[in-house]
């Protein structure tokens, strides 16, 4: 075993890449470390392409093992289960920048498996996983146009920070991950605290500059440790067939792509493609249908792109910077705590907001530690939204990714727990889709939160942008359609307020996109965002003053922390009785904060009264209505407050001399008593005599 090792300093950490010792039967395996966080990345590709396949089957599996953090998994089986939301998001983060680096026409199955085997809770495994994946693909011999570099960028006190750790990110106004090759940025994923466009773009450029050290180190590792390159050549296009397809379909496709209604357009495109295929098969029954489909797809792409570059109107007749017609409604459902319906052209989201207590917050136990998530956003994409039938079940990777992007867009404006002590769950149901449903979810969420009375700092809107570039000519498109998304060269989604960006996601498919092009695109996105915000603010301009009648109202009060055990009672008996008898939910915190949640105001008042009784201090000189609980020879014990008894001595029962206590009092009798003294041991001395109203003294002669 001869390990080949490369180490370099990156930000405040040392990165080490090692190959040649572990997993030697894979096409490539790299053990990558950043500090104490270590991942094993393996790459395996099938040498033979499966006949009839018309897509590139790349699978990225990212798995966090609990042993990496020195933990044993919970649950009955005590082993790792299906991927968590965080694992799914990191798998997508790795997949997005490596996919465009495989050549067109490469259809062999490739599987990348990233296993987190050791973790430092201060160093998130995502960046080192991406570096390790880039290194493993670079030395695998697969036709991979890398290496790929990656950097996380923070922004604190006006300065960019390279690869901030978990603690530094808490105070950072930016969490941006940028991946790219030596000459081009390929992917950006970020959330920010309403930062200006130039700061966001500066972060992208800074991250791309800094990651060159990663690319250089992987290039050195490749020179020493690479497997022989695969003997793969791109399939050669049949130029005669290309010309025939152009003659048969170009004019028809050009006309079809001027039909503005999506389903009608799809029908007409289908008719033209079918006619072309029939003509070609009639001429040559042996023709390869898969090749014909591929060439028709390429022609379709070329037709749309050339129209856009030539300055013609877009597929649906719009100019490049136009946003589709908007229809915005808040409060559309009667019993939900907040709701909205946001429609932009043929994209529509029905969004609901539900308020809950602290107990409803999501508790996450990951290898990075335990944390609580008070704000949840779930995105659903049913098949009917695109006029199809399909499987309905647990969320797929794409739905989890889109939900997280919308969450990032909104999170920066959410109130703190002190300002708004509720857990919030938002669900976005995509009811129609033709481009950028995730950004429709951002707009719909902002509206639904305001409708629910959540005091968000300001409205947030999102917009999806596209770019078509041919040579030096380029056109930036605002509010792209689904068709423009898959045949453009860049798609990026921007969410934000009037003041700045809260989330930015970019996926770039070509080299040569300069900082200037990105700057123009971001400025155009700003104009579109403000236009959408103006329309949204007409529907609901600020959060409702009061929450829904159907939502639980949370009332907060403070008690002496030493009294918490009195409220809980022996074995939780007191608090259990309180919640059951009043129908409220009661939460206690160590600092003496008590949160009472109920949608019934009277029930809340009753719970407050009873808690105040339990926690009240006995005051000397105060008269209480008490209840006799025990009679003894020398007096009677009287309960004056829940859990607080005092003694009325026999001499303090009446003005006259009392021989037998039972002649005056019985158990269960209610009496007025005055507190005379509370001694050092907390014993309470009471008097009925002093509490009785005094008879008027006779008037002087």
UniProtKB/Swiss-Prot annotation:
Its EC number is 2.7.7.8. The keyword Transferase applies. GO terms for molecular function: 3'-5'-RNA exonuclease activity; magnesium ion binding; polyribonucleotide nucleotidyltransferase activity; RNA binding. Mg(2+) binds at residues 485, 491. GO terms for biological process: mRNA catabolic process; RNA processing. Its main location: cytoplasm. Residues 552-611 form the KH domain. It holds the Pfam family PNPase. SMART domains: KH, S1. Its cofactor is Mg(2+). It catalyses: RNA(n+1) + phosphate = RNA(n) + a ribonucleoside 5'-diphosphate. GO terms for cellular component: cytosol. InterPro entries: ExoRNase_PH_dom1, ExoRNase_PH_dom2, ExoRNase_PH_dom2_sf, KH_dom, KH_dom_type_1, KH_dom_type_1_sf, NA-bd_OB-fold, PNPase. It is an enzyme of class 2 (transferase). The keyword RNA-binding applies. It is found in: Cytoplasm. Residues 621-689 form the S1 motif domain. Keywords: Cytoplasm, Magnesium, Metal-binding, Nucleotidyltransferase, RNA-binding, Transferase. Belongs to the polyribonucleotide nucleotidyltransferase family. Involved in mRNA degradation. Catalyzes the phosphorolysis of single-stranded polyribonucleotides processively in the 3'- to 5'-direction. Component of the RNA degradosome, which is a multiprotein complex involved in RNA processing and mRNA degradation. NCBIfam families: polynuc_phos (TIGR03591), PRK11824.1 (NF008805). HAMAP family: PNPase. This is Polyribonucleotide nucleotidyltransferase. It comes from Shewanella piezotolerans (strain WP3 / JCM 13877). The lineage of its organism: Bacteria, Pseudomonadati, Pseudomonadota, Gammaproteobacteria, Alteromonadales. The gene is pnp.
């Amino acid at each position: 075993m001869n390990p080949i090792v490369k180490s370099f300093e990156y930000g405040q950490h040392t990165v080490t890449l090692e190959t040649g010792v572990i997993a030697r039967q894979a096409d490539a395996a790299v053990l990558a470390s950043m500090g104490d966080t270590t991942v094993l990345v393996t790459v395996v590709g099938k040498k033979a392409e499966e006949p009839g396949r018309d897509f590139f089957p790349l699978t990225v599996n990212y798995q966090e093992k609990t042993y990496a953090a020195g933990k044993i998994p919970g649950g009955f089986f005590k082993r790792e289960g299906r991927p968590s939301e965080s694992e799914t998001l990191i798998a997508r983060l790795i997949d997005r920048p490596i996919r465009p680096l495989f050549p067109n026409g490469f259809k062999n199955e490739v599987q990348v498996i990233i296993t987190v085997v050791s973790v430092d809770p201060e160093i998130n495994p995502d960046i080192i996983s991406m570096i390790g994946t880039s290194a493993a693909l670079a030395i695998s011999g697969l036709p991979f146009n890398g290496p790929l570099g990656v950097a996380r960028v923070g922004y604190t006190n006006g300065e960019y920070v390279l690869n901030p750790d978990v603690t530094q990110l808490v105070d950072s106004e930016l969490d941006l991950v940028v991946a790219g090759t030596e000459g081009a940025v390929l992917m950006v994923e970020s959330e920010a605290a309403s930062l200006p466009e130039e700061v966001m773009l500066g972060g992208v450029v800074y991250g791309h500059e800094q990651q060159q050290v990663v690319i250089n180190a992987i290039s050195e590792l490749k020179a020493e440790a690479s497997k022989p390159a695969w003997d793969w050549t791109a399939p050669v296009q049949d130029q005669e067939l290309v010309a025939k397809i152009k003659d048969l379909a170009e004019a028809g496709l050009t006309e079809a792509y001027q039909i503005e209604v999506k389903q009608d357009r799809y029908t007409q495109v289908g008719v033209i493609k079918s006619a072309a295929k029939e003509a070609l098969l009639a001429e040559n029954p042996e023709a390869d249908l898969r090749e014909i489909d591929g060439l028709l797809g390429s022609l379709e792409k070329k037709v749309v792109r050339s129209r856009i570059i030539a300055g013609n109107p877009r597929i649906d007749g719009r100019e490049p910077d136009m946003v589709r017609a908007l229809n915005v409604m808040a409060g559309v459902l009667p019993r939900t705590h907040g709701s909205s319906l946001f429609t932009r052209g043929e994209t529509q989201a029905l969004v609901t907001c539900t308020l809950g207590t602290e107990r409803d917050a999501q508790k996450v136990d990951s290898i990075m530690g335990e944390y609580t998530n008070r704000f949840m956003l779930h995105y659903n994409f049913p098949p009917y939204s695109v006029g199809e039938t399909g499987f309905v079940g647990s969320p797929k990777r794409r739905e989890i990714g889109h939900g997280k992007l919308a969450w990032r867009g909104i999170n920066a404006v959410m109130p703190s727990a002190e300002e708004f002590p509720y857990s919030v769950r938002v669900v976005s149901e995509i009811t129609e889709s033709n481009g950028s449903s995730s950004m429709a979810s951002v707009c719909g969420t902002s509206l639904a939160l305001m409708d629910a009375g959540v005091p968000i700092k300001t409205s947030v809107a999102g917009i999806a942008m596209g770019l078509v570039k041919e040579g030096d000519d380029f056109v930036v498109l605002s509010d792209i359609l689904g068709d423009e998304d898959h045949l453009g060269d860049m798609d990026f989604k921007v969410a934000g307020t009037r003041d700045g960006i809260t989330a930015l996601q970019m996926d770039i498919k070509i080299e040569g996109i300069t900082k200037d092009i990105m700057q123009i695109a971001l400025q155009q996105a700003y104009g579109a965002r403000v236009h959408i915000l103006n329309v949204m603010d007409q529907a609901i301009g600020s959060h409702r003053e009061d929450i829904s009648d159907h939502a639980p109202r949370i009332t907060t009060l403070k008690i002496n922390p030493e009294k918490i055990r009195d409220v809980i009672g022996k074995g939780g008996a007191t608090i259990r009785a309180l919640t059951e008898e009043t129908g409220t939910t009661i939460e206690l915190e160590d600092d003496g904060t008590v949160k009472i949640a109920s949608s019934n105001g009277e029930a809340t008042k009753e719970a407050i009264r009873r808690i105040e009784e339990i926690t009240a201090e006995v005051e000397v000189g105060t008269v209480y209505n008490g209840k006799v609980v025990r009679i003894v020879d020398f007096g009677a014990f009287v309960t004056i407050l829940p859990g607080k008894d005092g003694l009325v001595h026999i001499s303090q029962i009446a003005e006259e001399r009392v021989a037998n206590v039972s002649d005056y009092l019985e158990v269960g009798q209610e009496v007025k008593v005055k507190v005379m003294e509370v001694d050092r041991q907390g014993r309470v001395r009471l008097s009925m005599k002093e509490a009785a109203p005094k008879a008027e003294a006779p008037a002087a002669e």
